[in-house]
Amino acid sequence: FILNKIPLKSHFNSEHYKGGIQNWSFDQDANGILYVANNKGLLEFDGNEWNKYKVPLSTKVRGVKVGRENRVFVGGQNQIGYFENTKKGFEFTSLIDNLEPNPKSIAEIWKIIEINGSIFFNTESKLLVYNGSEIRELNSPGFLQASFKHRNKLILQIYEKGLFEFVDSDFQHISGTQLLPEIVGILENVNDDIYFSRNGIVFKSNQLNTPFIDYSIKFGSINSAIKLSNGDFAIGTQNNGLFILNPNLTIKKHFTKNNGISDRTVKSIYEDNFNNLWVALNNGIDYLKISLPFSLINEEVGVEGSGYAVHNFKNKIYLGTNNGVFTQNLYSELTYPSKYIFFKGSEGQVWNFSQIDDELFLNHNKGAFKINDNSLEKFHDIGSWKFKKTNDPNIILGGDYQGIRSFKKINGKWNRSGEIPNLNESSRILEFENDSTLWMTHGYKGAYRLHLDSNLQLKKTIQHFGKHSGFPSNILISSYILNGKLVFTSEKFCIDRYF
C-alpha cells in the first residue's frame, strides 16, 4: 500500500555551497560528482563537500552538461567552455574565441544538450554546436524558443513556426506543431510522446492539435518536466511546487513549501544515478531521496507531535503521538490530496495500541480506551501502558502506572475486574513466558516474574531481577518473545537466558 508521505530530504542553501541563491540545471559525471549551474558560477558536490568555480568574464552559469572524458561544459553570460581535471587542477577552457564568425556577443546560454558527443548550446536566440574540435553557429529556422533532446535527436521550438528536428545538419519541420504553445518538455511514454507546455496544458504526439489534459489550474506555469527511470514524470512549477505523475498522467504526489520541499518555485529537476531527485528552487537546492523505502510522516501530512506507536487495523493506519491519535485509510493507490485525520477525544500522550483478537485498544496517559470506528470508549482512568491476551477470551491483563489489573468483558463492555496484589510499580511492558508465567519490566527498576494460577491469582511471591541477578543494570530492561523464546534487552545487551 502507499500512504501520503514525505520523502527524506536534504536542503542546501547559499551558506552551504557559498554561491548564489538561484540554481538552474544539474548534471552528474561518471564518478557520481554532481555539477550545478549557479548564479555565482559552477558548483561541484561530491556527496560531502561543495566547491565553487568561477567562469571567466561571467558571473551566472545557466547551463551545465558533462560530456566525453568527463569534461564539464558550462554556459554563462557571453561565455562558453568547459572545465576538466588537469595537472594544475580543475581548469576552465573557453570556446568563445574559437567561434566562427567570432561574435561580439552571444548573450546568455540557457541550456546545454549532448547528442552523440556533440555539445549544443542554446542561447537566447541562436544555437551553437561544438564537435570536440571546433565550435560554430547553426542556421536556425527562426527565433529560438527552446531546445530538447528527444529519442537521441535534437528538437527545436521556433517562435510561431513550431517544432523542428535536426537531421543531417539541417532542420526539418515537424508537421502539426505550428500552434503549440511554448513547450518545456517532450518526453517518451508507453505508446506515444508527451508534450508539456509552460502554461500547464499537456499534449500527446498523436493529437497535437487537441489538449490531452489541462493542468493549468493545478500546475500554473511549468518550468521543468522530466521522465523518471520508473516511468513516472516529475513536473516543476513556478508557484505550486513539484508534481509526480504516473504514466497515465494522473497525479500521484504533490510536494510544495511546507509539504515535502522548501519552496513553491521549482526551476529545474534532475534524477541522479541513485534515482533520487535534485530540485533547483528559487532559493537553494533540495535533495529528495525518493528511491529510499523510508519516508516521513509528520506535520506536513497532518500528523503533529513525536511518534510513539503505530498500528494497522481493519484497513486503517493508526499513529500515536504525544498529541493524540491520527488515522488514515490504507489505499492500494494514493489518492491526491490525502492527509491524516485527528481522532477526536484522543488529545494527549499516546503510549501504545494493543490489539486483542478483533478489538483495538488505546493505551494513553489519560487511561485505557477501546477504539471504535469513529469514537473512543474509555473504561479505565489510570494511565495505561499495554494490554495482554489471556486464555479467557473475555479477560485481558493491563499494565498501568500503578500496577497490573484484569478487565472482563460483560455485555460487550470492558470493566475492571481485579488486580495483582503487592505490585504497585508502573508496569510498562508485559510478556507471557507461558500460560502461568508473566514477566513485567520496569523502566529503571528491573524485571519482575509473576507465577499465576488459572484465575490470574499469584501462586508465589513476586520475584525481582536486576543487576544483582545478572542484568548489566536495572535500567531500560524490556522483554520480548522472539522465535518462540523469551528474550530480554537492556541498555547494553540482548540477553537470551532464563532465571
Show where each model-derived region lies.
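Carboxylate-rich, polar loop motifs that coordinate divalent cations or form catalytic acidic clusters
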Residues: 1-499
